[in-house]
Amino acid sequence: MAYKQKKYRGKDEKEQKKYILLDVGGTEIKGNVSDRNGVRTKIRKFPAQAQKSTEKILDNFAKICRELMREADGSVVGVGMAIPGPFDYENGISRMQGLNKYDAIYGIPLEREIKARVPELGSARFLFLHDIEAFALGESWYGNCRDADKILCVCIGTGAGSAFVENGKTVKTGKGVPENGWIYQQPFG
């Protein structure tokens, strides 16, 4: 990837607004800190603990946020979580059940629970995105596709996901775009 990596140092950089970015998976959670320009710290990996109890999962999210806050060395104004569905992205509430991951946090507002465990994030804004959409937007804004008007991203992991981006925004309907931008149910041939 063509992302810029940088460890934050120096007076001016300390004063920059920082964002904690988390890619929440079923096996591991990847995280780093970024500024508005996409300058970021090295990606760190943490165990997901996705099959544990409610308290252990929430405590794990809090622990990860605290560790990344130390790397931010400045003001954290936002937390972005790329997380698989089903999930209520607008309200930050997991709707996962029967997937052998994150069942214990079904119906729990994550922003409230993480802020209760990490009071230093009290004024930080949380944004939740579907994991494949977050990847696609990152590629569109900062990655190898930043000069493209339209892109299709396909991710294969535990499951398979897809996202369409046009002019820097995700597209879920329209000509050539299947419902929700999901290609997994499209016939081959």
What are these regions, as identified by a protein language model?
Residues 3-16, 32-38, 42-44, 53-55, ...:
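Glycine/GP-enriched mid-protein hinge/lid loop-to-helix segment characteristic of carbohydrate kinases
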Residues 19-23, 80:
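Short, hydrophobic/glycine-enriched beta-strand segments
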Residues 22-27, 155-159:
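A short acidic Gly-Thr/Ser loop motif
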Residues 23-25, 35, 88, 131:
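Acidic active-site catalytic centers that drive phospho-/nucleotidyl reactions
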Residues 29, 86-88, 161:
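Short, acidic Gly/Pro/Ser/Thr-rich loop/turn segments
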Residues 31, 81:
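Residue-level signal for inorganic ion chemistry
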Residues 46-48:
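Short loop/turn motifs that cap or connect beta-strands within the blades
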Residues 50-62, 66, 75-79, 85-150:
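Glycine-rich phosphate-binding loop and adjoining helix at the ATP-binding site
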